[in-house]
Amino acid sequence: MKNFFLILLVWVYAIYGNLLSAQNGIGETTALFSKQEPIFIKLNLSVKELKKNTNDSTFMESILYYKNEMEAYDSLKIDLRARGNNRRENCYYAPLKLKLSKSVTKGTFFEGNKELKLVLPCLIESNNNDYVIKELMAYQLYEIVTPVHYKTRLVNIEFVEEKGKRTITKDLKGFLIEDVDNVAKRLNGKEIKRRILALQQDDVASIRNAFFQYLIANTDFSTTYLHNGKLLFIDKKIIPLPYDFDMSGLVDASYAVVSNIQNISLDITDVKERVYKGYKRDVLLFEQVRKEFIDNKSKMFETIDRLEKYFEDKNQFIIAKRFVNEFFEILQNDTAFKNKILDQARED
């Protein structure tokens, strides 16, 4: 019976695992996201004017100063706007959407990127930069889970804020995220901009996403309602592409709250409590993805350790690493895996 199960698992992996092999090596990553070293940039902005005068369709002109390969500052003309309704209302710094023209980026390591997201700390508070590093950690852990992911790049920001006749300079951590069009191009896919029921999305890709959201203890997402996620059509499969993880338990930001975007009973009040929000699917596929995560455990902790040097409070790093390890303790325990994941999967 055990041999029969193993044969079935190999067969399932051969069928559904083709998604991985078909996507590896497709397209090229732009120079901006081909390296891990942080980029140094400088922005001169009025936060008040940015929030007041920009919206989903209205951008303002600005200059992005950055250190080039020669360690000398260069500059790009950009258009930018604040993004994220919740962050605009509740955060001091809103995340930014950047638009860059092809003629301006030609010959720079920004070439090939027409649009970018820039994640900033939410509030002026202790640990604000460490929250950014932990969210970056989430993105980079997801890179290990699946090739269908956003590329990211850490940035050190000299943020010069204009306040009337005064200027206030803050040293912030942030990171750039590639545009969804670049992700689709890199993977020879296409973005789907309409809602599609979760159970109509690819089984294995959906389980990978659900496991990952459970790993970071994130409730602030919905693949059906496209809340903090996109859908890509790749190799005749509909694949979820998640983003925005600052409300997760891994990040554990001071402003984070449990989300009930999917209108299901969660029975938790703390973002650090995990609850599995994925759907019931073939148990063999659950076992396949479980094995994938366990096999990638060492790679994940290598990624976590690589980010340690960027933390200002080393205790924040220790807590984050311990939090991820707790996920693997569940995954590697048959009883815990059944009780906390398999038995909790949703039917509707």
Where are these regions (language model features)?
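Bacterial Sec-dependent N-terminal signal peptides
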Residues: 1-24
